Protein backbone atom coordinates (compact mmCIF):
# COMPACT_ATOMS: atom_id res chain seq x y z
CA UNK A 1 0.00 0.00 0.00
CA UNK A 2 1.21 3.52 -0.73
CA UNK A 3 1.19 6.31 1.84
CA UNK A 4 0.24 9.86 0.99
CA UNK A 5 2.03 12.81 2.47
CA UNK A 6 0.06 15.01 4.85
CA UNK A 7 -1.87 17.69 2.97
CA UNK A 8 -2.16 15.66 -0.21
CA UNK A 9 -5.25 16.84 -2.08
CA UNK A 10 -8.30 14.68 -2.59
CA UNK A 11 -7.80 14.88 -6.37
CA UNK A 12 -4.23 13.62 -6.03
CA UNK A 13 -5.42 10.76 -3.84
CA UNK A 14 -8.02 9.74 -6.41
CA UNK A 15 -5.45 9.93 -9.23
CA UNK A 16 -3.03 7.72 -7.34
CA UNK A 17 -5.73 5.19 -6.54
CA UNK A 18 -6.76 5.07 -10.21
CA UNK A 19 -3.14 4.72 -11.37
CA UNK A 20 -2.56 1.86 -8.94
CA UNK A 21 -5.82 0.27 -10.08
CA UNK A 22 -4.74 0.56 -13.72
CA UNK A 23 -1.34 -0.95 -12.97
CA UNK A 24 -3.00 -3.71 -10.96
CA UNK A 25 -5.49 -4.71 -13.66
CA UNK A 26 -2.76 -4.80 -16.29
CA UNK A 27 -0.45 -6.79 -14.04
CA UNK A 28 -3.12 -9.31 -13.03
CA UNK A 29 -4.13 -9.76 -16.68
CA UNK A 30 -0.51 -10.41 -17.69
CA UNK A 31 0.02 -12.69 -14.68
CA UNK A 32 -3.05 -14.79 -15.54
CA UNK A 33 -2.03 -14.85 -19.20
CA UNK A 34 1.33 -16.32 -18.19
CA UNK A 35 -0.06 -18.71 -15.59
CA UNK A 36 -3.14 -20.30 -17.18
CA UNK A 37 -1.39 -22.15 -20.06
CA UNK A 38 1.35 -23.37 -17.69
CA UNK A 39 -1.24 -24.73 -15.25
CA UNK A 40 -3.04 -26.33 -18.20
CA UNK A 41 0.15 -28.20 -19.15
CA UNK A 42 0.62 -29.47 -15.58
CA UNK A 43 -3.01 -30.59 -15.26
CA UNK A 44 -2.95 -32.31 -18.65
CA UNK A 45 0.37 -34.05 -18.04
CA UNK A 46 -0.12 -35.28 -14.50
CA UNK A 47 -3.88 -35.37 -13.95
CA UNK A 48 -5.25 -35.80 -17.49
CA UNK A 49 -7.61 -32.89 -17.03
CA UNK A 50 -7.56 -29.17 -17.72
CA UNK A 51 -9.12 -25.77 -17.10
CA UNK A 52 -12.53 -25.38 -18.81
CA UNK A 53 -12.43 -22.71 -21.55
CA UNK A 54 -8.79 -21.95 -20.69
CA UNK A 55 -7.89 -20.99 -24.28
CA UNK A 56 -10.83 -18.59 -24.54
CA UNK A 57 -9.86 -16.93 -21.25
CA UNK A 58 -6.26 -16.53 -22.45
CA UNK A 59 -7.26 -15.04 -25.80
CA UNK A 60 -9.62 -12.55 -24.19
CA UNK A 61 -7.02 -11.58 -21.60
CA UNK A 62 -4.82 -10.60 -24.54
CA UNK A 63 -7.71 -8.53 -25.88
CA UNK A 64 -8.11 -6.79 -22.52
CA UNK A 65 -4.35 -6.24 -22.24
CA UNK A 66 -4.23 -4.69 -25.71
CA UNK A 67 -6.50 -1.79 -24.85
CA UNK A 68 -5.78 -1.29 -21.15
CA UNK A 69 -2.09 -1.77 -21.92
CA UNK A 70 -2.46 0.72 -24.76
CA UNK A 71 -3.89 3.23 -22.28
CA UNK A 72 -0.93 2.62 -19.96
CA UNK A 73 1.43 3.06 -22.92
CA UNK A 74 -0.22 6.44 -23.59
CA UNK A 75 0.24 7.35 -19.93
CA UNK A 76 3.97 6.72 -20.29
CA UNK A 77 3.99 8.49 -23.69
CA UNK A 78 5.54 5.39 -25.25
CA UNK A 79 3.41 4.81 -28.35
CA UNK A 80 5.58 4.46 -31.44
CA UNK A 81 5.82 7.51 -33.65
CA UNK A 82 8.20 9.04 -36.19
CA UNK A 83 9.68 12.17 -34.67
CA UNK A 84 12.32 12.94 -37.30
CA UNK A 85 10.12 15.34 -39.27
CA UNK A 86 9.00 17.15 -36.15
CA UNK A 87 12.58 17.64 -34.96
CA UNK A 88 13.43 19.62 -38.10
CA UNK A 89 10.49 22.01 -37.76
CA UNK A 90 11.09 25.60 -36.63
CA UNK A 91 10.34 26.02 -32.93
CA UNK A 92 7.38 28.31 -33.65
CA UNK A 93 5.67 25.53 -35.64
CA UNK A 94 6.22 22.65 -33.22
CA UNK A 95 3.44 23.73 -30.85
CA UNK A 96 0.73 24.14 -33.52
CA UNK A 97 1.74 20.86 -35.20
CA UNK A 98 1.50 19.06 -31.85
CA UNK A 99 -2.00 20.49 -31.29
CA UNK A 100 -3.10 19.40 -34.78
CA UNK A 101 -1.69 15.91 -34.18
CA UNK A 102 -3.47 15.74 -30.82
CA UNK A 103 -6.76 16.86 -32.40
CA UNK A 104 -6.45 14.24 -35.15
CA UNK A 105 -5.55 11.48 -32.69
CA UNK A 106 -8.43 12.34 -30.34
CA UNK A 107 -10.85 12.48 -33.29
CA UNK A 108 -9.81 9.05 -34.59
CA UNK A 109 -9.87 7.52 -31.10
CA UNK A 110 -13.33 9.00 -30.43
CA UNK A 111 -14.58 7.53 -33.70
CA UNK A 112 -13.24 4.15 -32.60
CA UNK A 113 -14.98 4.51 -29.23
CA UNK A 114 -18.33 4.75 -31.02
CA UNK A 115 -17.63 2.01 -33.57
CA UNK A 116 -16.34 -0.41 -30.91
CA UNK A 117 -19.38 0.28 -28.71
CA UNK A 118 -21.60 -0.48 -31.68
CA UNK A 119 -19.60 -3.65 -32.37
CA UNK A 120 -19.87 -4.81 -28.74
CA UNK A 121 -23.66 -4.53 -28.75
CA UNK A 122 -24.40 -5.72 -32.27
CA UNK A 123 -21.92 -8.59 -32.63
CA UNK A 124 -22.70 -10.40 -29.38
CA UNK A 125 -25.91 -10.90 -27.49
CA UNK A 126 -26.02 -11.23 -23.72
CA UNK A 127 -25.99 -15.04 -23.85
CA UNK A 128 -22.55 -15.23 -25.50
CA UNK A 129 -20.20 -16.10 -22.66
CA UNK A 130 -16.81 -17.45 -21.75
CA UNK A 131 -17.54 -19.54 -18.71
CA UNK A 132 -19.68 -17.22 -16.63
CA UNK A 133 -18.37 -13.96 -18.15
CA UNK A 134 -20.32 -12.31 -21.00
CA UNK A 135 -18.09 -11.68 -24.02
CA UNK A 136 -19.48 -8.15 -24.16
CA UNK A 137 -17.69 -7.37 -20.91
CA UNK A 138 -14.36 -8.07 -22.58
CA UNK A 139 -15.30 -6.14 -25.75
CA UNK A 140 -16.20 -3.08 -23.67
CA UNK A 141 -12.54 -2.74 -22.70
CA UNK A 142 -11.95 -1.61 -26.30
CA UNK A 143 -13.92 1.66 -26.03
CA UNK A 144 -12.67 2.08 -22.45
CA UNK A 145 -9.08 1.81 -23.67
CA UNK A 146 -9.62 4.19 -26.58
CA UNK A 147 -11.23 6.70 -24.22
CA UNK A 148 -8.31 6.47 -21.80
CA UNK A 149 -5.78 7.03 -24.58
CA UNK A 150 -7.72 10.02 -25.94
CA UNK A 151 -7.94 11.65 -22.50
CA UNK A 152 -4.21 11.22 -21.98
CA UNK A 153 -3.40 12.68 -25.36
CA UNK A 154 -5.56 15.68 -24.44
CA UNK A 155 -3.78 16.00 -21.09
CA UNK A 156 -0.37 16.02 -22.80
CA UNK A 157 -1.42 18.28 -25.68
CA UNK A 158 -0.68 21.59 -23.95
CA UNK A 159 -0.59 23.25 -20.55
CA UNK A 160 -2.42 26.29 -21.97
CA UNK A 161 -6.20 26.46 -22.09
CA UNK A 162 -6.87 27.57 -25.68
CA UNK A 163 -4.56 25.00 -27.38
CA UNK A 164 -5.98 22.29 -25.12
CA UNK A 165 -9.53 23.25 -26.12
CA UNK A 166 -8.46 23.09 -29.79
CA UNK A 167 -7.08 19.59 -29.24
CA UNK A 168 -10.13 18.59 -27.20
CA UNK A 169 -12.40 19.62 -30.05
CA UNK A 170 -11.27 16.31 -31.54
CA UNK A 171 -13.94 14.59 -29.41
CA UNK A 172 -16.59 16.48 -31.40
CA UNK A 173 -14.85 15.83 -34.75
CA UNK A 174 -14.60 12.12 -33.96
CA UNK A 175 -18.29 11.96 -33.07
CA UNK A 176 -19.14 13.44 -36.47
CA UNK A 177 -16.88 10.89 -38.18
CA UNK A 178 -18.66 8.08 -36.33
CA UNK A 179 -22.22 9.12 -37.19
CA UNK A 180 -23.05 5.81 -38.89
CA UNK A 181 -21.98 3.89 -35.76
CA UNK A 182 -23.98 6.28 -33.57
CA UNK A 183 -26.97 5.69 -35.86
CA UNK A 184 -26.55 1.93 -35.35
CA UNK A 185 -26.44 2.39 -31.57
CA UNK A 186 -29.57 4.55 -31.60
CA UNK A 187 -31.36 2.03 -33.79
CA UNK A 188 -30.29 -0.79 -31.45
CA UNK A 189 -31.92 0.91 -28.47
CA UNK A 190 -34.77 2.64 -30.34
CA UNK A 191 -35.77 0.64 -33.45
CA UNK A 192 -38.48 3.16 -34.30
CA UNK A 193 -36.15 6.08 -35.06
CA UNK A 194 -37.75 9.06 -36.82
CA UNK A 195 -37.16 9.17 -40.58
CA UNK A 196 -35.05 12.32 -40.39
CA UNK A 197 -32.25 10.18 -38.90
CA UNK A 198 -32.18 8.24 -42.17
CA UNK A 199 -31.97 11.54 -44.03
CA UNK A 200 -29.07 12.62 -41.81
CA UNK A 201 -27.31 9.31 -42.44
CA UNK A 202 -27.66 9.70 -46.21
CA UNK A 203 -26.26 13.24 -46.00
CA UNK A 204 -23.38 11.95 -43.88
CA UNK A 205 -22.49 9.36 -46.55
CA UNK A 206 -22.48 12.11 -49.20
CA UNK A 207 -20.16 14.32 -47.16
CA UNK A 208 -17.81 11.70 -45.76
CA UNK A 209 -16.41 10.59 -49.14
CA UNK A 210 -14.62 13.86 -50.08
CA UNK A 211 -13.82 14.72 -46.45
CA UNK A 212 -12.24 11.28 -45.87
CA UNK A 213 -9.86 11.71 -48.80
CA UNK A 214 -8.54 14.99 -47.38
CA UNK A 215 -8.26 13.54 -43.87
CA UNK A 216 -6.36 10.49 -45.13
CA UNK A 217 -3.74 12.77 -46.71
CA UNK A 218 -3.52 14.88 -43.54
CA UNK A 219 -3.19 11.75 -41.37
CA UNK A 220 -0.39 10.34 -43.50
CA UNK A 221 1.46 13.67 -43.33
CA UNK A 222 0.95 13.75 -39.56
CA UNK A 223 2.71 10.38 -39.29
CA UNK A 224 5.96 12.04 -40.35
CA UNK A 225 5.42 14.81 -37.82
CA UNK A 226 5.14 12.67 -34.71
CA UNK A 227 1.59 11.34 -34.64
CA UNK A 228 1.24 7.85 -33.15
CA UNK A 229 1.56 5.12 -35.76
CA UNK A 230 -1.38 3.10 -34.46
CA UNK A 231 -3.61 6.18 -34.79
CA UNK A 232 -2.48 6.76 -38.37
CA UNK A 233 -2.88 3.11 -39.42
CA UNK A 234 -6.25 2.73 -37.72
CA UNK A 235 -7.42 6.15 -38.87
CA UNK A 236 -6.56 5.52 -42.52
CA UNK A 237 -8.43 2.20 -42.37
CA UNK A 238 -11.43 3.88 -40.71
CA UNK A 239 -11.61 6.65 -43.29
CA UNK A 240 -11.25 4.22 -46.20
CA UNK A 241 -14.17 2.17 -44.90
CA UNK A 242 -16.20 5.33 -44.31
CA UNK A 243 -15.41 6.66 -47.79
CA UNK A 244 -16.60 3.47 -49.49
CA UNK A 245 -19.69 3.04 -47.32
CA UNK A 246 -18.30 0.01 -45.49
CA UNK A 247 -19.38 -0.99 -42.01
CA UNK A 248 -17.17 0.91 -39.55
CA UNK A 249 -17.64 -1.94 -37.07
CA UNK A 250 -15.49 -4.06 -39.42
CA UNK A 251 -12.30 -2.61 -37.94
CA UNK A 252 -13.09 -3.51 -34.29
CA UNK A 253 -14.31 -6.87 -35.56
CA UNK A 254 -11.03 -7.53 -37.39
CA UNK A 255 -9.04 -6.40 -34.35
CA UNK A 256 -11.04 -8.76 -32.12
CA UNK A 257 -10.68 -11.68 -34.55
CA UNK A 258 -6.93 -11.23 -34.71
CA UNK A 259 -6.32 -10.72 -31.00
CA UNK A 260 -8.19 -13.88 -29.96
CA UNK A 261 -6.11 -16.07 -32.28
CA UNK A 262 -3.83 -18.78 -30.92
CA UNK A 263 -0.52 -17.14 -31.85
CA UNK A 264 -0.92 -13.54 -30.65
CA UNK A 265 -0.67 -14.34 -26.88
CA UNK A 266 2.89 -15.49 -27.54
CA UNK A 267 3.94 -11.87 -28.16
CA UNK A 268 3.26 -10.52 -24.64
CA UNK A 269 4.57 -13.70 -23.02
CA UNK A 270 7.98 -13.78 -24.71
CA UNK A 271 8.24 -10.01 -24.27
CA UNK A 272 7.64 -10.45 -20.53
CA UNK A 273 10.26 -13.22 -20.40
CA UNK A 274 12.73 -10.87 -22.11
CA UNK A 275 12.01 -8.08 -19.65
CA UNK A 276 12.52 -10.38 -16.67
CA UNK A 277 15.90 -11.29 -18.16
CA UNK A 278 16.81 -7.65 -18.79
CA UNK A 279 15.82 -6.56 -15.27
CA UNK A 280 17.96 -9.30 -13.71
CA UNK A 281 21.73 -9.69 -13.90
CA UNK A 282 21.43 -12.27 -16.67
CA UNK A 283 23.07 -9.89 -19.14
CA UNK A 284 26.13 -9.48 -16.92
CA UNK A 285 26.41 -13.24 -16.43
CA UNK A 286 26.17 -13.94 -20.15
CA UNK A 287 28.69 -11.21 -21.00
CA UNK A 288 31.07 -12.70 -18.44
CA UNK A 289 30.65 -16.21 -19.83
CA UNK A 290 31.08 -15.24 -23.48
CA UNK A 291 34.03 -13.02 -22.60
CA UNK A 292 35.69 -16.01 -20.96
CA UNK A 293 34.95 -18.19 -23.97
CA UNK A 294 36.22 -15.77 -26.61
CA UNK A 295 38.68 -13.37 -24.92
CA UNK A 296 41.59 -15.37 -26.37
CA UNK A 297 40.42 -14.49 -29.90
CA UNK A 298 41.11 -11.01 -31.29
CA UNK A 299 37.72 -9.32 -31.21
CA UNK A 300 36.43 -11.77 -28.62
CA UNK A 301 34.52 -9.00 -26.84
CA UNK A 302 32.63 -8.32 -30.07
CA UNK A 303 31.69 -11.99 -30.43
CA UNK A 304 30.42 -11.96 -26.85
CA UNK A 305 28.42 -8.77 -27.43
CA UNK A 306 26.78 -10.15 -30.59
CA UNK A 307 25.77 -13.38 -28.85
CA UNK A 308 24.29 -11.58 -25.85
CA UNK A 309 22.42 -9.07 -28.04
CA UNK A 310 21.06 -11.90 -30.18
CA UNK A 311 19.89 -13.79 -27.10
CA UNK A 312 17.97 -10.80 -25.74
CA UNK A 313 16.43 -9.60 -29.02
CA UNK A 314 15.20 -13.11 -29.72
CA UNK A 315 13.09 -13.08 -26.55
CA UNK A 316 11.97 -9.47 -26.30
CA UNK A 317 11.06 -9.23 -29.98
CA UNK A 318 12.25 -5.62 -29.89
CA UNK A 319 15.76 -4.55 -30.86
CA UNK A 320 15.15 -1.25 -29.10
CA UNK A 321 14.70 -3.05 -25.79
CA UNK A 322 18.07 -4.74 -26.30
CA UNK A 323 19.77 -1.40 -26.98
CA UNK A 324 18.19 0.20 -23.92
CA UNK A 325 18.66 -2.79 -21.59
CA UNK A 326 22.15 -3.95 -22.59
CA UNK A 327 23.63 -0.85 -24.18
CA UNK A 328 25.11 0.41 -20.93
CA UNK A 329 26.74 -2.91 -19.98
CA UNK A 330 28.16 -3.58 -23.43
CA UNK A 331 29.35 0.02 -23.83
CA UNK A 332 31.49 -0.41 -20.73
CA UNK A 333 32.82 -3.81 -21.88
CA UNK A 334 33.74 -2.64 -25.37
CA UNK A 335 34.84 0.95 -24.82
CA UNK A 336 35.39 2.08 -21.24
CA UNK A 337 37.07 -1.15 -20.15
CA UNK A 338 37.78 -2.43 -23.64
CA UNK A 339 39.94 -1.53 -26.64
CA UNK A 340 37.34 -0.17 -29.06
CA UNK A 341 36.73 3.49 -29.82
CA UNK A 342 33.53 5.23 -28.82
CA UNK A 343 32.61 5.72 -32.49
CA UNK A 344 32.99 2.02 -33.23
CA UNK A 345 31.20 0.94 -30.05
CA UNK A 346 28.08 3.07 -30.47
CA UNK A 347 27.78 2.17 -34.16
CA UNK A 348 28.25 -1.51 -33.44
CA UNK A 349 25.72 -1.63 -30.59
CA UNK A 350 23.15 0.26 -32.67
CA UNK A 351 23.52 -2.29 -35.47
CA UNK A 352 23.70 -5.44 -33.35
CA UNK A 353 20.42 -4.76 -31.53
CA UNK A 354 18.34 -6.34 -34.30
CA UNK A 355 20.49 -9.38 -35.09
CA UNK A 356 18.28 -11.79 -33.12
CA UNK A 357 15.16 -11.34 -35.26
CA UNK A 358 15.88 -14.50 -37.27
CA UNK A 359 16.29 -16.97 -34.40
CA UNK A 360 13.62 -18.86 -32.44
CA UNK A 361 11.45 -17.90 -30.67
CA UNK A 362 11.48 -14.64 -32.66
CA UNK A 363 8.06 -13.00 -32.44
CA UNK A 364 8.45 -11.43 -35.88
CA UNK A 365 8.91 -14.83 -37.51
CA UNK A 366 5.86 -16.17 -35.69
CA UNK A 367 3.71 -13.22 -36.76
CA UNK A 368 4.88 -13.36 -40.37
CA UNK A 369 4.10 -17.08 -40.49
CA UNK A 370 0.59 -16.37 -39.24
CA UNK A 371 -0.02 -13.62 -41.81
CA UNK A 372 1.50 -15.64 -44.67
CA UNK A 373 -0.25 -18.83 -43.53
CA UNK A 374 2.88 -20.92 -43.58
CA UNK A 375 4.38 -23.20 -40.95
CA UNK A 376 6.07 -21.47 -38.02
CA UNK A 377 8.48 -24.40 -37.80
CA UNK A 378 9.41 -24.04 -41.47
CA UNK A 379 10.07 -20.33 -40.94
CA UNK A 380 12.36 -21.04 -37.99
CA UNK A 381 14.25 -23.71 -39.95
CA UNK A 382 14.60 -21.49 -43.02
CA UNK A 383 15.74 -18.49 -40.97
CA UNK A 384 18.54 -20.30 -39.15
CA UNK A 385 21.36 -20.02 -41.71
CA UNK A 386 20.45 -16.44 -42.76
CA UNK A 387 20.48 -15.54 -39.06
CA UNK A 388 23.94 -17.07 -38.72
CA UNK A 389 25.13 -15.07 -41.76
CA UNK A 390 24.00 -11.77 -40.24
CA UNK A 391 25.45 -12.70 -36.85
CA UNK A 392 28.82 -13.82 -38.25
CA UNK A 393 29.03 -10.64 -40.37
CA UNK A 394 28.81 -8.56 -37.20
CA UNK A 395 31.41 -10.74 -35.49
CA UNK A 396 33.87 -10.56 -38.37
CA UNK A 397 34.10 -6.78 -38.31
CA UNK A 398 35.13 -6.94 -34.66
CA UNK A 399 37.80 -9.52 -35.41
CA UNK A 400 39.14 -7.47 -38.35
CA UNK A 401 39.24 -4.24 -36.32
CA UNK A 402 40.96 -6.04 -33.45
CA UNK A 403 43.63 -7.47 -35.79
CA UNK A 404 44.23 -4.09 -37.44
CA UNK A 405 44.61 -2.33 -34.11
CA UNK A 406 46.61 -5.19 -32.54
CA UNK A 407 44.18 -5.52 -29.66
CA UNK A 408 45.65 -7.57 -26.84
CA UNK A 409 44.04 -10.92 -26.08
CA UNK A 410 43.81 -12.92 -22.87
CA UNK A 411 44.85 -16.56 -22.54
CA UNK A 412 41.98 -18.99 -22.44
CA UNK A 413 41.04 -19.46 -18.80
CA UNK A 414 39.04 -22.63 -18.20
CA UNK A 415 38.35 -21.65 -14.60
CA UNK A 416 36.70 -18.39 -15.71
CA UNK A 417 34.65 -20.23 -18.32
CA UNK A 418 33.58 -22.89 -15.84
CA UNK A 419 32.49 -20.26 -13.34
CA UNK A 420 30.63 -18.29 -16.03
CA UNK A 421 28.94 -21.45 -17.25
CA UNK A 422 27.91 -22.41 -13.73
CA UNK A 423 26.42 -18.96 -13.11
CA UNK A 424 24.57 -18.64 -16.43
CA UNK A 425 23.63 -22.25 -17.20
CA UNK A 426 19.98 -21.73 -16.31
CA UNK A 427 19.58 -18.85 -18.78
CA UNK A 428 21.44 -20.82 -21.47
CA UNK A 429 19.02 -23.70 -21.04
CA UNK A 430 16.02 -21.48 -21.85
CA UNK A 431 16.32 -21.66 -25.68
CA UNK A 432 17.09 -25.38 -25.40
CA UNK A 433 13.99 -25.82 -23.28
CA UNK A 434 11.88 -23.93 -25.85
CA UNK A 435 13.22 -25.88 -28.81
CA UNK A 436 12.70 -29.27 -27.15
CA UNK A 437 9.21 -28.60 -25.84
CA UNK A 438 7.84 -26.87 -28.94
CA UNK A 439 9.61 -28.55 -31.83
CA UNK A 440 9.14 -32.00 -30.27
CA UNK A 441 5.40 -31.35 -30.07
CA UNK A 442 5.22 -31.66 -26.28
CA UNK A 443 3.56 -28.26 -25.88
CA UNK A 444 1.92 -25.71 -28.15
CA UNK A 445 3.68 -22.45 -28.91
CA UNK A 446 1.44 -20.64 -26.42
CA UNK A 447 2.13 -23.19 -23.68
CA UNK A 448 5.85 -23.04 -24.45
CA UNK A 449 5.84 -19.25 -24.06
CA UNK A 450 3.92 -19.53 -20.79
CA UNK A 451 6.34 -22.11 -19.40
CA UNK A 452 9.27 -19.90 -20.51
CA UNK A 453 7.91 -17.01 -18.42
CA UNK A 454 7.39 -19.23 -15.37
CA UNK A 455 10.82 -20.80 -15.84
CA UNK A 456 12.75 -17.56 -16.12
CA UNK A 457 10.78 -15.97 -13.26
CA UNK A 458 11.70 -18.89 -10.98
CA UNK A 459 15.35 -18.78 -12.08
CA UNK A 460 15.78 -15.05 -11.48
CA UNK A 461 13.87 -14.98 -8.16
CA UNK A 462 14.54 -18.34 -6.52
CA UNK A 463 17.84 -19.53 -8.00
CA UNK A 464 19.79 -16.30 -8.57
CA UNK A 465 17.85 -13.97 -6.24
CA UNK A 466 18.41 -11.11 -8.72
CA UNK A 467 14.76 -10.22 -8.29
CA UNK A 468 12.29 -10.65 -5.46
CA UNK A 469 8.77 -11.90 -6.03
CA UNK A 470 7.49 -8.46 -5.12
CA UNK A 471 9.66 -6.99 -7.91
CA UNK A 472 7.77 -8.92 -10.61
CA UNK A 473 4.76 -6.55 -10.72
CA UNK A 474 7.21 -3.70 -11.34
CA UNK A 475 8.89 -5.64 -14.15
CA UNK A 476 5.47 -6.37 -15.65
CA UNK A 477 4.50 -2.70 -15.53
CA UNK A 478 7.76 -1.84 -17.36
CA UNK A 479 6.98 -4.47 -20.00
CA UNK A 480 3.35 -3.48 -20.53
CA UNK A 481 4.06 -0.20 -22.43
CA UNK A 482 5.97 -2.26 -25.00
CA UNK A 483 3.33 -5.01 -25.01
CA UNK A 484 0.41 -2.59 -25.22
CA UNK A 485 2.12 -0.50 -27.87
CA UNK A 486 2.81 -3.51 -30.10
CA UNK A 487 -0.59 -5.18 -29.63
CA UNK A 488 -2.60 -2.04 -30.37
CA UNK A 489 -0.56 -1.48 -33.54
CA UNK A 490 -1.38 -5.03 -34.62
CA UNK A 491 -5.06 -4.52 -33.79
CA UNK A 492 -5.36 -1.24 -35.71
CA UNK A 493 -3.26 -2.29 -38.69
CA UNK A 494 -5.42 -5.41 -39.11
CA UNK A 495 -8.28 -3.20 -40.29
CA UNK A 496 -6.07 -1.60 -42.95
CA UNK A 497 -4.80 -5.02 -44.00
CA UNK A 498 -8.39 -6.25 -44.30
CA UNK A 499 -9.36 -3.25 -46.45
CA UNK A 500 -6.34 -3.71 -48.73
CA UNK A 501 -7.26 -7.35 -49.35
CA UNK A 502 -11.00 -6.63 -49.64
CA UNK A 503 -10.31 -3.91 -52.21
CA UNK A 504 -8.21 -6.46 -54.17
CA UNK A 505 -5.15 -4.21 -54.06
CA UNK A 506 -2.76 -7.23 -54.06
CA UNK A 507 -4.42 -8.54 -57.24
CA UNK A 508 -4.17 -5.17 -58.99
CA UNK A 509 -0.54 -4.77 -57.90
CA UNK A 510 0.29 -8.30 -59.03
CA UNK A 511 -1.18 -7.69 -62.48
CA UNK A 512 0.74 -4.43 -62.83
CA UNK A 513 4.02 -6.05 -61.79
CA UNK A 514 3.45 -8.94 -64.23
CA UNK A 515 2.95 -6.55 -67.12
CA UNK A 516 5.84 -4.22 -66.30
CA UNK A 517 8.55 -6.35 -64.66
CA UNK A 518 9.70 -9.57 -66.29
CA UNK A 519 12.93 -10.25 -64.40
CA UNK A 520 12.99 -11.95 -61.01
CA UNK A 521 16.27 -10.16 -60.20
CA UNK A 522 14.77 -6.73 -60.89
CA UNK A 523 11.78 -7.65 -58.74
CA UNK A 524 14.06 -8.63 -55.85
CA UNK A 525 16.10 -5.42 -56.21
CA UNK A 526 12.95 -3.31 -56.08
CA UNK A 527 11.68 -5.39 -53.15
CA UNK A 528 14.90 -4.74 -51.22
CA UNK A 529 14.63 -0.99 -51.79
CA UNK A 530 10.95 -0.75 -50.90
CA UNK A 531 11.25 -2.88 -47.77
CA UNK A 532 14.31 -1.05 -46.43
CA UNK A 533 12.43 2.24 -46.84
CA UNK A 534 9.40 0.65 -45.17
CA UNK A 535 11.59 -0.43 -42.26
CA UNK A 536 12.65 3.19 -41.77
CA UNK A 537 9.11 4.47 -41.41
CA UNK A 538 7.14 1.57 -39.94
CA UNK A 539 7.73 -0.72 -37.01
CA UNK A 540 8.16 -4.35 -38.01
CA UNK A 541 4.81 -5.52 -36.62
CA UNK A 542 2.84 -2.92 -38.60
CA UNK A 543 4.81 -3.71 -41.74
CA UNK A 544 4.06 -7.42 -41.43
CA UNK A 545 0.35 -6.71 -41.08
CA UNK A 546 0.04 -4.07 -43.82
CA UNK A 547 2.83 -4.68 -46.34
CA UNK A 548 3.23 -8.48 -46.24
CA UNK A 549 -0.22 -9.14 -47.79
CA UNK A 550 0.90 -7.00 -50.75
CA UNK A 551 4.27 -8.71 -51.16
CA UNK A 552 3.26 -12.36 -50.73
CA UNK A 553 1.27 -12.65 -54.02
CA UNK A 554 4.16 -10.99 -55.89
CA UNK A 555 6.57 -13.57 -54.53
CA UNK A 556 4.32 -16.31 -55.88
CA UNK A 557 4.31 -14.70 -59.34
CA UNK A 558 8.12 -14.71 -59.52
CA UNK A 559 8.51 -18.17 -58.01
CA UNK A 560 10.14 -17.07 -54.75
CA UNK A 561 9.88 -19.78 -52.09
CA UNK A 562 7.35 -18.62 -49.44
CA UNK A 563 9.82 -19.11 -46.58
CA UNK A 564 12.62 -17.40 -48.53
CA UNK A 565 10.30 -14.46 -49.21
CA UNK A 566 9.56 -14.24 -45.48
CA UNK A 567 13.25 -14.16 -44.59
CA UNK A 568 13.91 -11.49 -47.25
CA UNK A 569 11.00 -9.48 -45.86
CA UNK A 570 12.18 -9.61 -42.24
CA UNK A 571 15.88 -9.10 -43.02
CA UNK A 572 15.08 -5.97 -45.04
CA UNK A 573 12.95 -4.51 -42.27
CA UNK A 574 15.68 -5.33 -39.78
CA UNK A 575 18.12 -3.29 -41.86
CA UNK A 576 15.57 -0.48 -42.13
CA UNK A 577 15.71 -0.03 -38.35
CA UNK A 578 19.28 1.25 -38.69
CA UNK A 579 18.93 3.13 -41.99
CA UNK A 580 19.59 6.90 -41.72
CA UNK A 581 17.93 9.28 -41.28
CA UNK A 582 14.83 7.84 -39.59
CA UNK A 583 15.56 4.21 -38.59
CA UNK A 584 14.02 3.62 -35.17
CA UNK A 585 17.18 2.16 -33.61
CA UNK A 586 19.10 5.33 -34.47
CA UNK A 587 16.83 7.38 -32.21
CA UNK A 588 16.99 4.85 -29.39
CA UNK A 589 20.77 4.67 -29.64
CA UNK A 590 21.04 8.46 -29.57
CA UNK A 591 18.91 8.46 -26.42
CA UNK A 592 20.77 5.57 -24.73
CA UNK A 593 24.32 6.76 -25.40
CA UNK A 594 23.49 10.47 -25.13
CA UNK A 595 25.00 11.27 -28.52
CA UNK A 596 23.72 13.64 -31.23
CA UNK A 597 21.68 11.91 -33.91
CA UNK A 598 24.04 13.03 -36.68
CA UNK A 599 26.93 11.37 -34.85
CA UNK A 600 24.97 8.11 -34.59
CA UNK A 601 24.30 8.30 -38.36
CA UNK A 602 28.01 8.53 -39.07
CA UNK A 603 28.94 5.79 -36.60
CA UNK A 604 26.46 3.25 -37.94
CA UNK A 605 27.25 3.54 -41.68
CA UNK A 606 30.04 0.87 -41.82
CA UNK A 607 27.78 -1.62 -40.06
CA UNK A 608 24.87 -0.69 -42.32
CA UNK A 609 27.02 -1.48 -45.37
CA UNK A 610 28.07 -4.85 -43.92
CA UNK A 611 24.51 -5.84 -43.06
CA UNK A 612 23.42 -4.71 -46.53
CA UNK A 613 25.98 -7.12 -48.03
CA UNK A 614 24.64 -9.91 -45.81
CA UNK A 615 21.10 -9.01 -46.90
CA UNK A 616 22.05 -9.24 -50.58
CA UNK A 617 23.58 -12.68 -50.00
CA UNK A 618 20.41 -13.85 -48.23
CA UNK A 619 18.20 -12.40 -50.98
CA UNK A 620 20.02 -13.64 -54.08
CA UNK A 621 21.23 -17.02 -52.82
CA UNK A 622 18.03 -18.82 -51.77
CA UNK A 623 19.99 -21.99 -51.04
CA UNK A 624 20.90 -20.59 -47.62
CA UNK A 625 17.21 -20.51 -46.73
CA UNK A 626 16.00 -23.68 -48.42
CA UNK A 627 18.79 -26.18 -47.75
CA UNK A 628 17.69 -26.98 -44.19
CA UNK A 629 14.06 -27.06 -45.29
CA UNK A 630 14.97 -29.75 -47.81
CA UNK A 631 16.64 -31.74 -45.05
CA UNK A 632 14.23 -31.19 -42.15
CA UNK A 633 11.17 -29.34 -43.47
Task: Indicate where each model-derived feature is located.
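Alpha-helical transmembrane segments and membrane-interface helix-loop junctions
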Residues: 1-197, 488
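Alpha-helical transmembrane segments of multi-pass membrane transport proteins
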Residues: 127, 139, 164-633
